[in-house]
Every structure is written in C-alpha cells, then in structure tokens.
Amino acid sequence: MANTSRKWTRETWQIAAAMIQYPNVLADGSSVQDQSVEQWAETLADVVDAGFTELDPTDSWIRLADLPAARRDDFVKLTRDLGLSMPAISTSRRSVIDPEHGDEYLAYGHRVIDTAAAIGAGSVSFGFFGPLTDAQKKALWFWTVDGVKNPEDPAVWRQAVQRIRELGRHAEELGIELALEMYEDTYIGSADSAVRFVTDVGLPNVGINADLGNLVRLHRPVEHWQPMMAKVAPFAKYWHVKNYYRTEDETSGLVVTHPAPLEFGVINYRAAIRMALAHGFDSPFLCEHYGGDGLSVSAANRDYLRRILPRD
C-alpha cells in the first residue's frame, strides 16, 4: 500500500466531526443562525473536548452559506481560536431536483461552494435525498420508514446531471471537489446508479461520497457492502463513515439493523478504505453516528481510523 505521493498520514489525515447531533432550530424556537459567537462557542466546546481538530459545519446545524459575510467571518475566527479547521461542508436534504425548491437549492449550492472557498474547505457534499416525512419523524430510526424517492424519469435524471455538472464546474474553478452522498431511493442510491450518475456528469472533481452506512441500515435487501465498495472506490471523494449491525434471517426475510461503532458493524472499514486507497483516495473523512452520545462514538471512530490509515 506504499504511496509516496500520498498527502496525509494516519496522524495528519483530516477527519471531521459531524454536527448531526445539534439541531438548527433550538428548543425555545430560536435558530443557530442567530446565536451569538459565545453561544456557538459553547456548542463547539463539545467538539474540541471530544478531541477533534476538524469540523464539518453541517448545514442541518448551521447554514454558513446563509450567514452575512461578517457573521461568517466571526464563525471562522471562532473555529480557528478553538483550534478547529473546516476541510469540508456537508449539505442535507436540499436536493437540486426538489420539485418545489430545486431552483432555490441550486442557488444555495452555488453559495455553499463559494463559502467553502472562503473558509478554506476543499470538499462539499451534496445529495438528492428529500425532507423527512411525518412518518419518518415519528419513527425511532427514520430509515426504517420509506421516505421521498427520486422519480424514475429520464428528464429529471438529465436535469440532475446538468445541475450537478453546473455546480461541479463552479467548484472546479475554485479547486473544490464535490462528493455525492449515497442514500437510498435516490440517483446515488446504489453503487451501479451512483457510478452511472457521476460518469454522466463527467467531471474529474465530482465523485461519490461512499456513505454505505446509509444503505446497509435499511430493513430491506441490499447489495453486500463489499461489491458496492469495489464499484464506487475509483470514484470515492469526501467520505461520510458510519456503521451498523445488520442481521438477516433468510428463512423469514426479517432484517434488523442498529447503529454500531465503526469497527464493530457489518462494514469492514479496514478493507473498504484499502479499496479506496488503491484507487488514489486522498479526501477527508467525516465521522457521524446516530443514537446515544453520537459525538463521543464519532470520536472513537476517528481514533479507529487513525489506527488503520497508512502510516506514511
């Protein structure tokens, strides 16, 4: 696995904390968008105390691209004062083909790319997954209930390709990569479809966010993680990593899943990462975990990654 051109080692690889544990709208109805710098600092202290040196300002927590420039600069200064860098920005449930808000989210995507350039982030993650349905919001684990599906319509597929290509060209001008998040029932919802989609986009800076955890957690038949990873590895870019226990009863068809620490779930990340490295993978990671103290589990996952990534 020696690669003398690799830009990071296991000690220096950028491994960011996700902010999925923290909502944008707080219990009192106020928004993180309007918090003071001191209030932001209280939240980010959790990230620092968990040992992270990288942060993904996930837009389910804070929409940096929608902050006034002066407020954004205040946020960036705060992160630097806390010893945090921001290698990437992830977007969530703002699909550029949303039937109601697609145009709005496309414009937002361009602002995210500009914001990434302004804060020094080299990666942005986009997806085609829609808002949670009411039934999903009521479920203990939202992925056990079917959500919004991308239409099986060639015209919408072409529109999605065109819009991601547009964003990709913008990002390319700024030296930024785009990673499209694997998520069920979307155009990036299987390995085969994801590869077909990024191939149709046809830009070297547009690849796949190989978030296989989003698929193996489903209570339905899914392709085994290993052939999925083999297909997407040549296209892997900024990578959301999480894992799940998965039990399948072949006689009854019962499937049960539950969030797991990265090293314990059904996906062997030592093997998966080696597949990606063999194809030159050199993008940051994002650690995320649902349930319990997800930030602390993500910190343990970060430490696991540092044990299995290349020494040099």
Where do the model's predicted regions map?
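Acidic/histidine-rich catalytic cores of soluble enzymes
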Residues: 10-15, 23-30, 54-55, 81, ...
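Residues at the N-termini of beta-strands
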Residues: 54, 123, 238, 283-284
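Short, flexible, mixed-charge acidic loops at enzyme active sites
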Residues: 31-34, 132-144, 247-256
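N-terminal pre-domain/capping segments
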Residues: 1-123, 152-155, 165, 172, ...
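Acidic-and-aromatic substrate-binding clefts and catalytic sites of carbohydrate-active enzymes
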Residues: 34-36, 58-71, 94-105, 131-135, ...
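A short helix->loop->beta-strand "cap" motif at the edges of active sites that frequently abuts
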Residues: 84, 121, 176, 279-283
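Hydrophobic alpha-helical segments and helix pairs
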Residues: 117-149, 153-160
